[in-house]
């Protein structure tokens, strides 16, 4: 799997959350992490990403992992540091 393919999978997943959260969501591509197991994608509301106005920031939007081998998506969490969640994939 390529990063482009993983990005498409992540974007479809994030777009599927828009109705639930009530706003347009975007991937923060400059924050994407590549690891041996796959890619870690971050997302936020389009308004917050474009304006930086915290009134439009999402809460609880944990990074998602797209696995390199099969394209499966795993959601992380926000209670622990990101590295704690990523250890399970290494």
Regions found by a protein language model. Name each.
Residues 26-66:
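Exposed beta-strand-loop-beta-strand "reactive/processing" segments of non-cytosolic proteins
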Residues 13, 39-43, 85:
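Aromatic side chains
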Residues 3-6, 82-90:
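Short alpha-helical interface patches
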Residues 60-87:
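A short, surface-exposed interaction/processing loop segment used at functional sites
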Residues 3, 11, 52-54, 73:
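Histidine-/acidic-rich catalytic cores in large beta-rich domains
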Residues 23, 28-31, 87-90:
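Charge-dense, low-complexity polyampholytic segments
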Residues 1-28:
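Short, non-transmembrane alpha-helical segments in secretory-pathway proteins
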């Amino acid at each position: 799997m390529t990063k482009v393919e993983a990005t498409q999978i992540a974007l479809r997943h994030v777009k599927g959350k828009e109705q639930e959260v009530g706003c347009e969501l975007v991937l923060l591509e400059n924050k994407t992490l590549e690891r041996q197991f796959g890619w870690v994608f971050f997302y936020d509301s389009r308004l917050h990403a474009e304006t930086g106005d915290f009134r439009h920031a999402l809460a609880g939007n944990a990074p998602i992992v797209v696995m390199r081998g099969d394209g499966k998506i795993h959601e992380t969490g926000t209670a622990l540091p990101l590295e704690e969640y990523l250890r399970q994939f290494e």
